[in-house]
């Protein structure tokens, strides 16, 4: 009963701070501070400084700003236009037509970005005008973008997997490799849904595409070569053991700069904008991770994680039952918090439960990302829905309905 009282206290302070407009990272530190003051005699200030510094100076964490910077650089190149020109000849003859470019484009860009928002914005600004001009159903255009953009959370280099790995001190490279196949399977399922919908829908009447010969398709595919080389360098260097995740991220930044320069889109303005964009995003995530580290330490002093793990053990839940409970919990949490915040907020309590149940932490990381992907397109806080609303000027209810399938 005492454990539930502590949980209620932590949740009350957390939602009080978040409801007051305090940043998530600072709110986590505030909750941890209250816990340390009430349940320990340790000097809170010294503990907080030491914990925040340790969390912020982690070598593993250096991969995060580098991958974000790589995505920011590519966002400001002509990569999206080139991808559409390279993919559209191959997608046009499939059931569902050019809507598949949303899915394949998001899959490809996710492999060089790691950010769901960057993937959505980059592919969306290219595909939405083109698909509208060809009279594809608006709900399908928006729905496939909303869903496929979440692949940026699964396919390496995924920022969510990096944050998860840093939070539980797990190998980033192993998490990346584990995310490749599930990401491709999800992309295939999205494409299957589009193909089936195009055959049964009565509103599907796009403008026919001109037929191209095989040689013409191959010629247009040359626009995909730069991004495929970059993907091979970043992912291949990790897979073959030539580089760690951080070193691969550095290769990605260099490759992104070279790609931008070769396209003539690299100048001081784009360079500084990409650097500042990456700095802002990285600082936000680093603050959340620092707050989560302090909160984890505070919870450790209270004995809450171990107490909850023992309680779960007393309930004698099977692995499947535990996963179903956590699935419902994260779906509800995802309605109010973004994916990264959901991960760092809960891992201090959830990780001991998972270890106690004997569930592999790499597998559970992929499970969490799939649920977080749902949160990205779940009202009222689904971030992808807000991005799409700004791009299409549709009502939030319309976009949410389009994203349901």
What are these model-derived regions, one by one?
Residues 1-405:
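Alpha-helical transmembrane segments of multi-pass membrane transport proteins
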């Amino acid at each position: 009963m005492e454990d539930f009282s502590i949980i209620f206290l932590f949740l009350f302070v957390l939602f009080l701070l978040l409801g007051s407009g305090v940043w998530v990272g600072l709110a986590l530190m505030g909750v941890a501070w209250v816990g340390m003051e009430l349940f320990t005699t340790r000097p809170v200030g010294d503990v907080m400084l030491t914990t925040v510094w340790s969390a912020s100076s982690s070598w593993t964490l250096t991969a995060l700003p580098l991958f974000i910077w790589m995505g920011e650089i590519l966002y400001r190149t002509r990569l999206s236009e080139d991808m559409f020109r390279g993919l559209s000849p191959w997608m046009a003859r499939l059931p569902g037509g050019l809507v598949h470019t949303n899915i394949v484009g998001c899959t490809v860009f996710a492999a060089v970005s790691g950010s769901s928002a960057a993937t959505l914005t980059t592919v969306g600004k290219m595909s939405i005008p083109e698909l509208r001009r060809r009279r594809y159903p608006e709900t399908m255009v928006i729905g496939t973008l909303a869903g496929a953009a979440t692949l940026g959370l699964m396919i390496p280099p995924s920022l969510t997997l990096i944050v998860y790995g840093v939070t539980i001190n797990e190998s980033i490279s192993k998490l990346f490799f584990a995310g490749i196949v599930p990401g491709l399977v999800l992309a295939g399922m999205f494409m299957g849904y589009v193909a089936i919908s195009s055959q049964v829908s009565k509103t599907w009447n796009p403008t026919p595409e001109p037929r191209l010969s095989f040689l013409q398709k191959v010629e247009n595919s040359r626009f995909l070569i730069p991004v495929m080389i970059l993907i091979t360098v970043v992912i291949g260097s990790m897979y073959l053991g030539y580089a760690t995740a951080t070193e691969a991220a550095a290769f990605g930044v260099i490759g992104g700069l070279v790609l931008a320069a070769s396209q003539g889109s690299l100048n001081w303005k784009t360079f500084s904008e990409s650097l500042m964009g990456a700095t802002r995003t990285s600082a936000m995530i680093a603050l959340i991770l620092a707050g989560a580290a302090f909160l984890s330490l505070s919870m450790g002093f209270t004995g809450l994680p171990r107490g909850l793990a023992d309680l779960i053990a007393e309930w004698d839940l099977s692995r499947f039952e535990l996963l179903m409970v956590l699935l419902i919990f994260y779906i509800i949490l995802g309605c109010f918090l973004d994916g990264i915040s959901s991960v760092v907020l809960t891992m201090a309590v959830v990780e001991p439960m998972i270890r106690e149940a004997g569930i592999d932490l790499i597998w559970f990381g992929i499970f969490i990302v799939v649920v977080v992907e749902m949160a990205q397109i779940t009202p009222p806080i689904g971030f992808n829905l807000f991005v799409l609303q700004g791009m299409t000027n549709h009502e939030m209810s319309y976009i949410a309905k389009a994203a349901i399938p």
